[in-house]
Every structure is written in C-alpha cells, then in structure tokens.
Amino acid sequence: MSKNELKKAAAMEAIQFVKNVNIVGVGTGSTVNYFIDALAEIKHQIEGAVASSVATENRLKEHRIPVVDLNSVSNVDVYVDGADEFNKHFYLTKGGGGALTREKIIAAAAKRFICIVDESKQVDVLGQFPLPIEVIPMARSFVAREIVKLKGDPVYRQGFTTDNGNVILDIHNLTILNPVELEAILNNIPGVIANGLFAQQPADDLLIGTPAGVQLHHRK
C-alpha cells in the first residue's frame, strides 16, 4: 500500500468515532483531508464541525458540512487531526501546515483527541521533522536567537503567514529528549504564540495506518 492509501485508511477508521456526536473538531493537512471527505458521507449525523484553519473550513464548506465557531459551542466532543511525528508516549510534532496554534486550541477544548497517521510518522525520538513555532513578526529575530541557545537551527518560513497573521520558524537539528519540558520552555519565550509539540496534552488515541490494517492505540 502507498503512503496515501495508509493515510486514507486511518482517516476512514476515524469516522466510526464521530458518528452521532454533536461537535467534531477538524485538524489540517493531507491525512485530515481524507477524513473530511469521509465525514461528508455522515454529515447529517453531526451538528457541526470546528475548523482549525481557513483551508479546512473551505474544504468542509465545499462538502456542505456545517462549520461552527469555537466560541459558539460549549463542548467539542472529538478532535481529529494528523501529525508530522509521533512516539510511543503519544507525544506529537505538528504544524507542518502552519495551523499549529488553532490545532492546539481545539485539541485542548476537545473531550477526546484522535490522531490519524500512517506508520512512517513513528519515531523513537521527536525532532527528525523540523519543529514549527508560531511567532509574532516583530519578535522573529529575537526568538531565533533564543532558539540557537537551545541548540536548534531556526529557519524562517519565508512567504508564509499563518491564519492568525503571524510567521513560522522551523527548528531543525533539535533532538527532543524531553518534549514536555521543551514545550514549556518554548512557550515561555516572549513573542512565541505556540509551538508544534503536543506533549503536555498528547493524543488520547492513535489510529495508525499499516499494510496489515489500521491499528488503534489508546493512551492509558
């Protein structure tokens, strides 16, 4: 099976967890796009979807799936999103698509966070994929210097602006031995809006697409 077929299999499996719930949080990315396409088939069974990006909102609307604002709902029943990396502790690296801040907000608001991935995203130690951080534009150079102090190599994602009007620094060559600690350190740098580590609040469930089928892992 191709990587795209594995992504699609994981996304399709996630549909069973959102049937007959009120509000579904929807992430951003190529794997999530398969989920949105499948969600369209059961859109009559949900009240609405909270989108983590403009791109996701547009795709939901193309399928005539009702989109609701997070401020207008009291609960998000399930949040479904992909990841750029994951490890055995359910810690994730996310934000390759630049939507990390809104993704993190909806994941925190949701009762359950289901991460859909293909097996190629599994790593022993996070950091092989560059870690994105969303930064207020005026703080970009300052934050970059602080990242260098942490032994990372920050690269400005030129020509990209987040849906929140900010910029992205991608941190390369950073071996993340303690994701929970590093997430807090990065968040405490003035000018950082959010970073792509989902360790303080990891995924609740992993749906992993493999050639042998989709594996479900639940965090204990």
From Swiss-Prot:
GO biological process, one term: pentose-phosphate shunt, non-oxidative branch
Catalytic activity line of the entry: aldehydo-D-ribose 5-phosphate = D-ribulose 5-phosphate
Pathway this chain belongs to: Carbohydrate degradation; pentose phosphate pathway; D-ribose 5-phosphate from D-ribulose 5-phosphate (non-oxidative stage): step 1/1
Keyword terms of this UniProt record: Isomerase
Domain of life per record: Bacteria
Residues that, per the record, bind substrate: 28-31, 81-84, 94-97, 121
EC number: 5.3.1.6
Active site: 103 (proton acceptor)
Broadest EC class assigned to this enzyme: isomerase
Protein family: Belongs to the ribose 5-phosphate isomerase family.
HAMAP family in the record: Rib_5P_isom_A
Assembly description: Homodimer.
Name this protein carries in UniProt: Ribose-5-phosphate isomerase A
Source organism: Coxiella burnetii (strain RSA 493 / Nine Mile phase I)
Gene: rpiA
